[in-house]
């Protein structure tokens, strides 16, 4: 209890200094510098509070008070005795102060208006403040802001961060991060150089943003450079950190590809998030941007070198390059929701729309996360499945129709597979190259598992294969990894597959 009391006292004193600086006679620029410096120099206090709050389930019952003004919040803080509630009030007050400071003219690099940049009425009141750390000493603003965002996420689990990275000769140069708040109409786009962040800044960024499962991270086409960079260089190949990061990762490229590949009116699956050619621009295809906005974007892109020729240097970025970098994350959250909205328009029934939302928000994201973990050797389910099926592909059964190889049984029983909860057509699912091999590998392993129990199998003309392949480890893995929708899908598929195999094999 003494430790808790000390933490509360320290946090309140920490906040009081922020309040004193905010109410001082300094200019807005000097206020923000002093506040950010104070937060940076005393980062152990908000980090300590973050750890304490994350360990307490009571936070799930409390909402941050975004409605009260600063005077009302300060009055509530002085009267409140409960540690959790008092902390939430202090965090609300910090939100009020920091969002006021960071959006004051002179304290940001540029500004983008939702009404000018996007064709979606729901974001026309949004303002995107772009901040670029052109000098190393300015990284304290990034540090102060992410500490606040991480603290807020303890009570507010509807945060998104749009993420992108820029590389020169495959070496990281920039991180662009669009911090999307579900209550505020102000979004903050931070552009920093990871190479120039102090260790404590990067460590806290990883801890309270990247590995924070309360915050969803949105990327687009991240498999070639972004994911390997994050897994290897930022998360140090640590499976625990990588799994936490990946658990709330969304890659909109694969949602876009799924939609296009399963649409009757689309002839290709090109999903560049934006492009000077309208036919290749995904945000234009899904009507996130208008004709006029597409033309403006095309003019910017035409003025730039080819993407692989761009030399990125955070200290020497022309306006066009800085705007290009901001666009990479500006659209991501809106684009994500727009894909889902467009997909739901193809079904008029409430249950149909619900099934589509479930597919896009959960199942497609889970399979994307699963594939990233498997491709990078963090989890090894596919490797185990492949190891067990490859050696028995040509083993066979005998029945009234003659000899049938196990691989042929798989090809026969895996046609036309569907599930009802979640509502999935496996053939549609497998049209996305990213998904095809993992889905096929797991289904094949399930099929061979049932064959091993239900059929008399021969290794050759005279040798019976007696091994039994239990499928339970697949479902145990999916449950452990919290791939709940994938788990339900494969369990339902397994029932269908078992019944089909029983019809083919002689039951012992």
UniProtKB/Swiss-Prot annotation:
SUPFAM superfamilies recorded: Ribonuclease H-like
Keywords attached to this entry: Virion
Locations listed in the record: Virion
UniProt GO cellular component terms: virion component
Gene Ontology molecular-function annotations: nucleic acid binding
The keyword Ribonucleoprotein appears for this protein: no
Listed name of the protein: Uncharacterized protein L533
Gene3D superfamilies: Ribonuclease H-like superfamily/Ribonuclease H
InterPro entries tied to this protein: RNaseH-like_sf, RNaseH_sf
Organism for this UniProt entry: Acanthamoeba polyphaga mimivirus
């Amino acid at each position: 209890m003494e430790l808790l009391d000390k933490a509360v006292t320290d946090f309140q004193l920490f906040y009081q200094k922020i309040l004193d600086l905010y109410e001082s006679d300094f200019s807005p620029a000097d206020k923000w510098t002093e506040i950010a410096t104070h937060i940076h120099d005393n980062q152990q206090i908000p980090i300590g509070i973050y750890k304490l709050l994350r360990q307490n389930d009571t936070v799930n019952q409390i909402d941050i008070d975004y409605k009260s003004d600063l005077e009302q919040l300060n009055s509530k803080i002085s009267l409140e005795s409960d540690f959790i509630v008092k902390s939430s009030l202090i965090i609300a007050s910090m939100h009020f102060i920091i969002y006021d400071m960071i959006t004051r003219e002179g304290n940001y690099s540029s500004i983008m208006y939702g009404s000018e940049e996007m064709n979606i009425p729901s974001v026309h009141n949004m303002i995107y403040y772009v901040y670029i750390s052109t000098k190393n000493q300015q990284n304290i603003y990034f540090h102060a802001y992410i500490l606040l965002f991480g603290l807020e996420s303890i009570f507010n689990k509807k945060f998104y961060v749009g993420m992108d990275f820029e590389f020169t000769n495959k070496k990281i140069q920039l991180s662009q991060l669009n911090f999307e708040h579900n209550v505020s109409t102000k979004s903050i786009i931070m552009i920093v150089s990871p190479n120039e962040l102090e260790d404590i800044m990067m460590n806290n960024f990883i801890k309270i943003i990247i590995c924070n499962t309360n915050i969803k991270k949105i990327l687009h086409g991240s498999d070639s450079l972004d994911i390997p960079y994050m897994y290897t260089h930022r998360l140090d190949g640590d499976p625990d950190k990588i799994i936490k990061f990946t658990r709330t990762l969304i890659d909109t490229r694969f949602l876009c590809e799924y939609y296009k590949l399963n649409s009757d009116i689309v002839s290709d699956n090109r999903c560049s998030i934006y492009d000077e050619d309208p036919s290749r621009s995904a945000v234009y295809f899904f009507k996130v941007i208008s004709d006029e906005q597409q033309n403006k974007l095309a003019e910017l892109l035409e003025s730039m070198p080819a993407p692989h020729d761009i030399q990125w240097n955070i200290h020497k970025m022309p306006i066009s390059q800085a705007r290009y970098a901001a666009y990479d994350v500006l659209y991501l959250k809106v684009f994500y929701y727009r894909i889902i909205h467009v997909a739901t328009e193809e079904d008029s029934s409430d249950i149909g729309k619900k099934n589509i939302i479930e597919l896009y928000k959960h199942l497609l994201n889970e399979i994307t996360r699963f594939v990233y973990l498997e491709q990078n050797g963090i989890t090894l389910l596919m490797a185990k499945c492949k190891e067990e099926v490859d050696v028995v592909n040509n083993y066979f059964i005998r029945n009234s129709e003659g000899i049938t190889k196990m691989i042929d049984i798989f090809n026969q029983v895996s046609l036309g597979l569907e599930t009802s909860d979640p509502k999935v057509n496996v053939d549609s699912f497998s049209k996305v190259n990213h998904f095809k091999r993992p889905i096929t590998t797991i289904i094949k392993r399930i099929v061979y598992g049932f064959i091993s129990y239900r059929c008399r199998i021969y290794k050759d003309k005279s040798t019976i294969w007696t091994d039994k392949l239990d499928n339970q480890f697949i479902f145990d893995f999916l449950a452990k990894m919290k791939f709940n929708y994938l788990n339900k899908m494969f369990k339902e598929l397994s029932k269908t597959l078992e019944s089909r195999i029983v019809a083919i094999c002689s039951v012992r």
